[in-house]
A protein has these predicted regions:
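N-terminal phosphate-binding loop and adjacent alpha-helix
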Residues: 27-62, 71-78, 183-184
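Glycine-rich phosphate-binding loop plus the immediately following alpha-helix
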Residues: 40, 111-205
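Short glycine-rich phosphate-binding loop at a beta-alpha junction
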Residues: 61-72, 147, 241, 254-264
Length: 304
């Protein structure tokens, strides 16, 4: 059996993922939990990490590379930001060591856009960009990373020129649970209404100024003409994703389509949205991208 060379950790706000990686970059063991930054701040970051390392029988001196919210100001050790324009190679060079630990633990920095008119930050997504594009990426790329807070980044020659964050996932959660539209989606089952989703994407993309009105129409249409809770859910999702795409696709584009870094249900929804709008999109699995980015960092730090 192959021997682990390092552990790679993606530490989000509400989630934790760890992989034991061998010399060839293969995954030997995997751990997942809901012990994200919020939980780890209470339990102790070192204790949470050690519990997962113990569960996979990791050696006491096994090095660990971490990306995500463990490096936030409220996290374990603040890893700071690289300012745009930020070359992806800088991520490899500016990992921050965690002091006072028996093993070598490094946390990767985030990226900041210090523009008074469009301030923005990312932490964790930079590692996905690194894994998706590589440090030697040539040409122009527009990258969409869906999530609770979706990121759109414009990358030129391996340098993140600009990026923007959209609270699409969080808005979907709030709108569908905490507003009048919660009544429209009550008891929604798993059935999909692809046509409702596609129609909502197009309407929002073509008339983003009507965002608030389009959302209310989900409820009024159901009251006046009927429709299932599942269909209403798909309309809300399509509306919010359509609004995001209207902004993300605005302005100059690379000419080579969109690089979509996503997994699971989000990958399916965003790919359908791009196809509906006749926008070419190349899909890269988000989990593979973050793992590849962490591996690139480990190789640069420890010359694995």
């Amino acid at each position: 059996m192959s021997q682990a060379e390092y552990a790679a950790v993606d530490w989000g706000t509400s989630s934790f993922r760890l992989w034991l990686i061998d010399r060839a970059g293969g995954v030997l063991e995997e751990r997942r939990s809901q012990e994200g930054m919020v939980a780890a701040a209470k339990l102790g970051f070192a204790a949470v990490l050690q519990s997962h390392l113990d569960a996979v029988d990791a050696a006491n001196d096994l090095p660990v590379v971490v990306c995500g919210m463990a490096g936030a100001r409220q996290g374990w050790v603040e890893a700071g930001y690289i300012d745009t324009p930020a070359h992806l190679a800088f991520i490899l060079e500016r990992a921050v060591p965690v002091p006072g630990q028996s093993r070598d633990i490094r946390i990767l920095p985030g990226i900041a856009q210090r523009d008074p008119k469009a301030p923005d930050v990312m932490r964790g997504e930079e590692t996905q960009l690194l894994g998706a594009l590589g440090v030697d990426a040539m040409g122009e790329a527009v990258v969409c990373i869906p999530g609770t807070h979706s990121k759109w980044a414009r990358v030129s020659g391996g340098t993140v020129e600009r990026f923007a964050t959209f609270m699409t996932g969080e808005l979907f959660s709030v709108v569908s649970r905490e507003t009048i539209l919660s009544h429209a989606v009550t008891d929604a089952d798993e059935a999909e209404d692809t046509e409702a989703f596609k129609s909502a994407v197009v309407a929002a993309f073509e008339t983003p100024a009507l965002a608030a009105n389009l959302l209310f129409r989900v409820r009024s249409s159901q009251l006046l003409y009927g429709g299932s809770p599942s269909s209403a859910r798909e309309k809300i999702s399509g509306t919010l994703i359509g609004l995001e795409l209207a902004a993300g696709l605005a302005g100059d584009q690379s000419g080579s389509g969109i690089t979509l870094v996503a997994s699971g249900r989000l990958q399916v929804l965003y790919r359908l949205a791009f196809d509906t709008l006749a926008v070419a999109a190349q899909s890269i699995d988000a989990e593979e991208a973050v793992r590849r980015g962490l591996s690139m960092a480990a190789e640069a730090i420890w010359t694995v």
